[in-house]
Amino acid sequence: MGHDPEVAAALRRDLPVTSDELGPKTYLELQALAGVLPFGLRHYWKGHFLRALDADTFEQLVQTVGDDDAVGAAFILLEGMVGAGRTEPDGGAAFGQRAAAWNVSALAIWESPEDDDVAIGWSRRVNDIVAPLSLTGGGYVNYSPVDESAERIRAAYGDERWARLLAVKRRYDPDNVFRFNHNIAPA
């Protein structure tokens, strides 16, 4: 996976450019990007881990961004899964998507509650485009929207990891004190 100048040139040519941050980034640079989003914005992020990203799906994603029918800022995050994220021994951590080649997530970010339906709808449409290529039916839990289904949260971990997480929850948080995230109920 690396930086392909031809792919970068095609993206810059075919999409309206509002900000050009395309290119390799260190982990530190990636983490610093979070500072560009001020407090108070509304967010709805949804995606899938994919085995592969084929040309037809990529074209649909480009078209969806080009349609620009979302309000505020609409991004499609394409994260290549490389390095340690793919080489951790099976069962070594809670992250269950080691076989994925890509994490593809739609990020809708806007200001006004009146725009909720349009922005959330855009993110869900992007999610529907990549769903047929999904590795497990689950997305990255840290990007999951507040209305994420229990089935998709479980699919993100896989059955074996889910069982281990339930056991940890039962042992260390039986009263479900830590419930304000994408909850794993102790029962």
Regions found by a protein language model. Name each.
Residues 1-187:
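Soluble FAD-dependent oxygen oxidases
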